[in-house]
Amino acid sequence: SNEFDELLENIKLNLTTLFNLPKNFDVLLIQGGATFQNTLLPMNIDKNKKIGVLVNGTWGKKTYEDFKKLNPNTDLFEVSKNNLGEYLEKNNFENLDYLHITSNETIEGIQIKDFNEVAHSNLLVDMSSDLGSYPFSFDKVSYIYAGAQKNMGIPGVTICLVNKDFLIDVDNSSYLNLKKLTTSNSVLNTPPTFSIFVLNLVTEWMIKSGGLDYFEKKSISQSNELYKFLDENSNLFDFSSELRFRSKSNVVFKFKEDKYNDTFIKQANDSGIIGINGHRLSLIHI
């Protein structure tokens, strides 16, 4: 309908404003979540192109496993715990056409906010858990994707920010053809209308609140208070020790004595603070 077309155009304008989106980028809103991107992306890259996947946590590992099945020309770059800074300084990822990174590993609590830390100029970035929480540069970016439900809406719609130069002609079925999806203005099939409607409301609110600078300051302030407490009580807790890559979106920690973890989570639940046991693979996740 004309009304929905207007809604889509308004969201594109909001996202362009929020992210200061360059003119050579387009906005795509589709279904399938971030996991679907592990299928969509490798199927829309020339099989002769070499892809690398930087793995510094659980979600990056899942991406690598899926990419490798669909594009055997995919290399693994795996980082050991608390060694991301040194790894990025030593690796220039030469001979790669594209490098995939996960900006925020929610289970490990590790975050790459500055893409210039990564020595590659064609980045594919999973920003599912921190898109909308800080400003960043698109200079090295070919493609960004994120499920809206973490910071910018409700489940059902995935936000994709696409460098138009990344799009190529492929002989895939329609919904696996990234170029067709993008040029269809996100309506190749029936779009997730309510999720998109909510996304529009949230992006308008984010702009009125002060944009990405405001949300970055808020996340830094709140996470720093918690990290300060953990640092002061490091004899009690295990958590990320690599200061510059500590996640500002979610702080992950556990008690060194396991018996206290369940007690802490139960007392939080009793106080109305639910879900801090986070993902099924993590312990305490705030």
List the model feature ranges, each with a label:
Residues 124, 137-149:
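Conserved active-site segment immediately N-terminal to the catalytic lysine
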Residues 67, 79-131:
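Active-site phosphate-binding strand-loop segment of PLP-dependent enzymes
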Residues 148-227:
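Active-site C-terminal subdomain of aminotransferase-like
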Residues 35-99:
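PLP-dependent aminotransferase-like
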Residues 237-267:
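Conserved PLP-binding catalytic core of the aspartate aminotransferase-like
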Residues 284-286:
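Conserved small/polar residues in nucleotide/adenosyl-binding loops
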Residues 1-37, 44, 56-58, 66:
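Conserved N-terminal alpha-helix of the aminotransferase class I/II PLP-enzyme fold
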